[in-house]
């Protein structure tokens, strides 16, 4: 039975540098606004399935 083991250290990788770093501040602001708009559209989706479930629970039940 081995009493020791070899442990490799972690490898650190640098994240890729975005092209936004090279853009001037007006281009950077425009890109950030566009990205924020895409996130907002996804966050504010109508969630039709949730709305339908609420409507279904509000319907009177048949007895």
Curated annotation (Swiss-Prot):
Give one Pfam family: DUF2735
The cross-references to InterPro entries, in alphabetical order and at most eight, read: DUF2735 (IPR021232)
According to its UniProt entry, what is the function of this protein? Inhibits the synthesis of glutamine synthetase II.
- This chain belongs to which protein, by name? Glutamine synthetase translation inhibitor
Q: What is the native source organism of this protein?
A: Rhizobium leguminosarum
